[in-house]
Amino acid sequence: MFYSLGSIYLSKNLLDNPEPKILHISDTPTVLYSQLKRIITKIQPEYIIHTGDLVDNIKLSIYPSRIDEYSNGVDELIEILESSSAKEIHITLGNHDNKNIVRNFTNRSTVYEKNAVINIGNISLKISHYSNDFIISPSNFNLFGHDISLGSQVINGKVFLNGIQNINIIALNSKKVFSLPYPIGTNESRLGKFKIGM
């Protein structure tokens, strides 16, 4: 019901889960920001990972003249992420990101230009904007976005989570993954075909 109304449904199982959590998002258009803020407030993730294209409704590599609009979007998103109670925030840059603008607005986030391997608790995670960065040597958990050439799945015991398909929440102790569908209109906004006020 919430999904069809433009909100993201948070299950009782997720909300009642007492474990520390990792929130994984990717390719976020500005229309999603208010829902993202709501999710962060409700689930209080200890770790946030964004795998690139922070303002995905602005294809900066295609439309460089929209850099001011992009900059405003980055400012808004970073404010949401960094005002959370998360212990760590990790951001990999996407093909439509500007590293100087992202770094200008971040205070407590770690920004990676390419892929990185990070360890959170007893979980090793490889994070990148691109799924092809994982083909040769995947980690236990592999988080990415960009496109749907590789969907979220488990291959040979390795977990691959595509942040463009779903918002992913990993419970740290059990390693249980909660996948939340994006609201209707998210993909249209990513493609620049959808304009609404949320």
Locate each region found by the language model.
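N-terminal pre-catalytic segment of deacetylase/amide-hydrolase enzymes
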Residues: 1-16
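Structural motif
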Residues: 14, 40, 81, 134-135
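A short, charged/proline- and glycine-enriched loop
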Residues: 16-22
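Active-site neighborhood of phospho(di)ester-bond hydrolases with catalytic His/Asp-centered motifs
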Residues: 24-27, 48-53, 90-95, 126-129, ...
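Short, glycine/acidic-enriched loop or turn micro-motifs at the edges of active sites
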Residues: 29-30, 56, 132, 149
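Core catalytic region of metal-dependent phosphoesterases/phosphodiesterases
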Residues: 30-115
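Conserved beta-sheet core of the metallophosphoesterase superfamily
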Residues: 116, 120-188, 194-195
